[in-house]
Amino acid sequence: MLSRISLPEGFSISLYSNPVPGARSLALGVRGTLFVGTRSRTVYALSDTDGDNYAETVHIIADNLNTPNGVAFRDGDLYVAEVNRILRYDEIESHLASPPAPVVIIDTLPNDAHHGWKFIRFGPDGKLYVPVGAPCNVCRRNDERYAAILRVNPDGSNLEVFAHGVRNTVGFDWHPESDVLWFTDNGRDNISSDPQINDNSPPDELNRAREAGLHFGFPYCHGADVQDPQFGLERNCNEFTPPQWELPAHVAALGMRFYTGSMFSASWKNVIFIAEHGSWNRSTPIGYRVTAVRLDESEKAASYDVFAQGWLGSDGTAWGRPVDVLVAPDGALLVSDDRKGAVYRISR
C-alpha cells in the first residue's frame, strides 16, 4: 500500500509501528514514547526500544474511556481528553506495562458527542488548550464554551475561553519563534441546496490567533466572507478574524505541526504540515493527504501544496485517512491513520 504514496524527491515513507487500531492524535514522551489517542475507548503507547525507527512494542494505557482522541505530555505525565473529562496519568513512561489509575483534572466539559472528540496540547504559556466543537453542523449556543478553544491550568483550575467562533478544530500548534497559535478548522456541511455549491463551499481554514479573545466567525461567517444562510445576516463578516489560508472545502483538515526538525533540508524549516482526513460527503472525494503551508517573513501564510498523497485511489476509494502529524526527535515526520490503524514515518 505504501508504494502508492507519492512524496517530493528524496523523501520516503515506512510503517512506524505494529497496528494501532483507530490511530488519531499523537504526543511524544520525554523518553521517546509515542502516545496515540483514538475515537474508540483506547489509548496506546508505542516504544522503539532498539532504535531501528520501528516501534515494536505497543502498550495499552487505557481501554475503557469515552472517545479519548486527545493526548498531551508534560513533565512526565500523560494527559488524555475524553468528551467531557481531562485525565492525567502520572509518570507514565515508568509504568507503560502497568499504567496507574488516572487523576481526573476536569470533568465539567460539555458531553455532546457531535464534534465531542478533542485534540489537546500544552502551549508555551504552560496551559493546556482544549477545543470544544459546535454540537451540530451549524447552530448557536448560549454557553460560550461551544465552538471555542479553551485553556486551563495543568491542575484543571482557571478554565477560560481563548478563542471564539471555531466550529471544529482538531489540530493546532504554536509558531516556534513567535509562540503564536495556529489551528485548523473544519467548515460546515450542506450550505446550499445546490450540490455543486456544497462541493466547493465553504472552505476549511488555517487560522492564526495572535492574542486571546478573537472571534473566527462561526456560525455567522465561514472562511473570509461566506455568509451562513441561517445566521449570516446577523453579523458582518468583517467583524471577525479571517483565516490565514482558505483550504479546499471538505478536505477535513485535522492535525497540524510546524516542522522543527533537522532531517529535512533548511527550506522546510517552520513549514506547517497538515493532515487532511478527507471528505465524506463530496461528489468527488478530496483530501486524504498531507499538505504543506509555507509562511512569508511576516509569518503570514504564503503557499499551500500537496506533500504526501496516494491514500485516495483514482477510483475515489480511500484506503487510508491521515489524522495527525508529529515531528519525531530525529526529524522524521510521523503521520497517524485511523482507517488503516497505522502510524507512518516520513524521512529523508
Protein language model regions, located:
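Beta-propeller domain segments
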Residues: 1-9, 117, 134-137, 147, ...
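Surface loop/turn motifs at the tips and blade-to-blade linkers of beta-strand repeat domains
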Residues: 15-20, 59-65, 105-112, 161-165, ...
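Structural WD40 beta-propeller signal
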Residues: 19, 29, 74, 121-125, ...
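Beta-rich catalytic cores
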Residues: 22, 30, 57, 64-67, ...
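Hydrophobic core register within WD40 beta-propeller blades
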Residues: 26, 71, 120, 169-172, ...
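Short loop/turn segments immediately following the C-termini of beta-strands
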Residues: 31, 38-39, 83-85, 91, ...
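Conserved beta-propeller blade signature
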Residues: 33-37, 77-80, 127-131, 180-184, ...
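Asp-box/WD-like beta-propeller blade repeats and closely related beta-sheet repeat scaffolds
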Residues: 57-58, 67, 72-74, 84-123, ...
